[in-house]
Amino acid sequence: MKKLTAVALGVSMALTLGACSPQQEQNNQQSQQAEETQQQLTSGVILENFDHSAKPQNDLFRYVNGSWIEKTEIPSDRSSIGAFYDLREMNQKRLRDIIEGAAAANPEPGTPERKIGDFFNAYMDTETLNELGAKPIASDLEAIQALDSHEAVAEHMARMFRSGVSIPFGFYVYPDAKDPQTNAMYMYQAGLGLPDRDYYLKDEEKFEDIRSEYVSYITDILGMVGLENTDEAAERILDLETKLAEVQWSRVESRNADKTYNKKTADEVSGMFANFDFKRFIETSELSHVEEMVIRQPSFFEDFGNMFADVDLQTWQDYLSLRLVNEYASALSEEISQRRFDFYGTVLRGTPEQEPRWKRAVDATNSVLGEVLGQVYVKEYFPPEAKEKMEGLIENLRDAYGESIKNLEWMTEETKEKALEKLAKFDPKVGYPNEWRDYSELDISATDLVSNYKAYAEFNYQEEIAKIGGPVDEEDWGMTPQTVNAYYSPVRNEIVFPAGILQPPFFDMDAEMAVNYGGIGAVIGHEMGHGFDDQGSKYDGDGNLQSWWTEADRKAFDERGQKLSEQFSQYEPIEGLNVNGDLTLGENIGDLAGLTIAYEAYKMSLDGEKAPVLDGFTGSQRVFIGWAQVWRGKYREDAIRQQVMRPSLAG
């Protein structure tokens, strides 16, 4: 995003693609000699994926990936395929080896190694799961059906809330945006069964069909767990969730860092809830000690509080039953798990089949015991020299970003000085955390999968609430080392790159650096860019949510951002469905910043020397080829629709 600022939006895509034209750099004797001195390095270019019938200056993506696109089919158990998928697939296999290796060693009960083996085995034991059916949650369903008042519903929501089951609102613990050294409790709208509020509110035929399928799914899944009159319950649930959707904020509104920071006392929050017994909820949630909370969407909580008592008791019982079943369906019988997938996997994302059981078991084990697996993962698959090389890349990108800020013609010196100060304070984290999570208080069974999920939810909940009001742990990570992703945290002013993404095609230790600048370099620049995008730029170098721009500079920046938003809003990946440029603006700024800064950093890294020509491509060309390679991908139409409506790109 900062590149948006740094290059001022005046750089056209045509010029960017033109950088891959072979005529732009001379393949003279000097570059050939440089090539000879670096023959031990590969180009990192995946030549077999190229489509030479395409012109790189017209369609770089197809030029670099066209052959791959034509010959690649999306696996039947996936909604998409691409570079991210390839890495995740490889990591799944690696994690399976780690899990099975730990289990085969017959470790002592209670050890981390025993816990990952027991959890995995419990997930793989389909014979027991099928025999039990819905019995593991029968008592939970009975408790919901026994609720005899709205006060009891509020209290029971608290029990579900702490066990990780979705209710109409949620919370998380994160540094206070206006006191970033202290952890605060943030509350946000939640509780919908469909991916976004628009799935309930849009009149298009596609969404009407999805709602019809949703009603069928609810009818079936609640019947499978033993409830009666589920067709009527399904209609009541859809009606309730539609009412919740009507008062929820849009995703664009929920991106606004200023509007979503609303600190309230516990008494003020209780007053917002009106007819919902929030004090009873807080007591049951063990949150009575929390004096202040940050409310992200205040009007939603007020509207929810007003409507709560108007919704009859039976409807709340239906709704909570569905929330419970949705949460635990994958831990029940194969029949129940399959029915959930038929809707959420096939109807919503177009994926024909579930992944093999072992892959789901690996993902589930990873979601619960990720840092146990992560410790072994980094020892086996992330060499120290990769961390060192990555840290050098980050500093090169930081230098290039600083130069771009200094050269901005439209930004005043006052704002430039503060922007450079923020850039200097970026805290990069690479590979893995310095401190590992302690799972000693978490009990895992080798035979009871649902109890494992419940135990982890309570374990995680107690860890989180203990942080509220306390000092921020600077060593805390938001991702496990094996995660194929990266992120920027504005309130921490940190950029984080787990070991999982630091592999080819993003980061290739055996390749000459040009392709790495186009791959992981652009990812680094992307995350840095988030520090200066339309929302990240509202935080200063210490993570405080406060204005540090002059009024004129903010206006100039917003005008440029609006142009980018308008450009992306013209893109129509599916007929009749346009990208929402306001919603994707942060990611678009990050991408523009990332690639541009990565290219500038690469040129700076040459220090006046000629780049080698490898596989017939100059250094500059390989930077842009590297960028195109990491974004190769194919998507099913339903997956594209969901991605457009709720974008979740890396970072």
Model-assigned labels for residue ranges:
Residues Q38, N275, V294, P298, ...:
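Intrinsically disordered, low-complexity linker/terminal regions across diverse proteins
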Residues T16-A19:
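C-terminal motif of bacterial Sec signal peptides marking the signal peptidase cleavage site
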Residues S53-Q57, V64, N91-L95, P112, ...:
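Stable alpha-helical elements in mature extracytoplasmic
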Residues S21-Q23:
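Bacterial signal peptide processing site
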Residues M1-L4:
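Positively charged n-region of N-terminal signal peptides that target proteins for export
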Residues E100-G392, N396:
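Noncatalytic, helix-rich "gating/capping" subdomain that lines the substrate-entry/channel surface
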Residues Q26-V45:
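Post-signal peptide N-terminal segment of mature Sec-exported envelope proteins
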Residues Q38-L41, H52-N58, Y63-L129:
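Active-site-surrounding "flap" and adjacent substrate/cofactor-binding loops of secreted or lumenal enzymes
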